A protein has these predicted regions:
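Core alpha/beta nucleotide-donor-binding catalytic domains of modification enzymes
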Residues: 2-123, 133-146
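Short catalytic/ligand-binding loop motif for oxyanion handling, primarily in non-cytosolic enzymes
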Residues: 17-18, 93-97, 135-138, 170-174, ...
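Short, P/G- and charge-enriched loop/turn segments at secondary-structure junctions
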Residues: 73-78, 166-168, 271-274
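Extracellular structured ligand-interaction cores
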Residues: 83, 175-177, 281-283
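Short, well-ordered beta-strand micro-motif
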Residues: 87, 179-183, 287
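Conserved Class I SAM-dependent methyltransferase catalytic core
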Residues: 108-183
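Flexible, glycine-/basic-rich loop-and-beta segments that form/coincide
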Residues: 171-239
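C-terminal target-recognition/interaction regions appended to catalytic cores
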Residues: 233-306
């Protein structure tokens, strides 16, 4: 079967793309405005031996894309007999509950409309839109979300939407996201189903998770046998061999705040900042950029990037 062709926007370091590639889709175009993210994208694909997208890596702002070039590439893929999909998660800080709530008129918020306009202009066979829970649950942002839905419906799309949590799918993080998917072909839309949940209906939160424990540098704690290890921070520390990773010693060195590094209890994520992970629990939502600091469970420092 011919692989569907994916045009990726707001690609970041490429994790959404990687998910599609793993499921047999072909990412043929990558658009990411932030150069460090795009460099990380290129590097990781090179390491994994994944060929570069045939229409290249594009660091143009989505607001400034040359429509004719994109249209030509979309048509080329369709003429090759391929289904074409647009995927993207526009920057979310303006809709985030923990952010500044500038909404659709914010510098980042307006890019959601730009992406939806792009979908309506180029009419891919399907599209995916991803954003934070605040776009779905906050009244003024929800009105904007519903307006975007009406626009893609008028363009001929049948829609599926769902507020999902990453932990439902086995990721060790409590991370809500609204997913909107649209299909031009109604027959194709009827085949779509929300599947793949490892822990559906909130079952991941029903285990007897630890809450907080006294912080102890390099302390040892055993996991309760009733807790699934794959949903725990420590499991992934060990699986990814973070202690021997190239960045293992490269952590943020604070000029102030060391006392808090030494006193916040393991698992105490009750504050907006200085949240200490618990080794035998999933992570709270990672939302860096809102002055968040996530502390290592049993070391006097922040976590490193592995």
């Amino acid at each position: 079967m011919t692989k569907p062709s994916i045009f990726s926007f707001f690609s970041g370091a490429g994790f959404l793309d990687l998910g599609f590639e793993t499921e047999g889709f072909d990412v043929c175009y990558v658009n990411e405005y932030h150069t460090p993210f795009l460099d990380a994208y290129k590097h990781s694909r090179k390491v994994m031996g994944i060929p570069a997208p045939r229409y290249g890596h594009d660091d143009t702002s989505i607001e400034d894309l040359v429509s004719d070039n994109l249209a030509s590439n979309v048509v080329t893929e369709m003429e090759r007999g391929r289904l074409v999909g647009f995927i993207g998660g526009p920057p979310c800080p303006d809709f985030s509950i923990g952010g500044k709530n500038r909404g659709k008129d914010g510098e980042n918020g307006k890019l959601s409309k730009v992406y939806i306009d792009l979908v309506c202009e180029h009419k891919p066979d399907f599209f995916l839109f991803e954003n934070v829970k605040g776009l779905y649950r906050t009244k003024k942002h929800r009105e904007f979300f519903e307006k975007m839905k009406r626009k893609v419906k008028r363009a001929g799309y049948t829609l599926h939407e769902r507020l999902i949590n990453a932990i439902e799918y086995g990721a060790p993080q409590n991370r809500d996201r609204i997913i909107l998917i649209g299909f031009l072909d109604k027959a194709l839309s009827k085949k779509f189903a929300w599947t793949g949940q490892v822990y559906p209906d909130g079952k991941a939160f029903e285990f007897e998770w630890p809450t907080t424990d006294t912080f102890g540098p390099n302390s040892v704690r055993e996991r309760k046998s009733t807790i699934p290890s794959e949903l725990c921070v420590q499991y992934w520390f060990e699986k990814n061999e973070v202690d021997t990773h190239a960045n293992a010693c490269h952590c943020f060195q604070p000029r102030a705040g060391l006392q808090r590094f030494q006193t916040v209890a393991e698992g105490d994520d009750s504050k907006k900042s200085y949240k200490r992970l618990h080794r035998w629990r999933y992570s709270p939502t990672a939302a860096y950029g809102n002055n968040e600091v996530h502390l290592h469970p049993y070391r006097e420092r922040r976590i490193t990037v592995a």
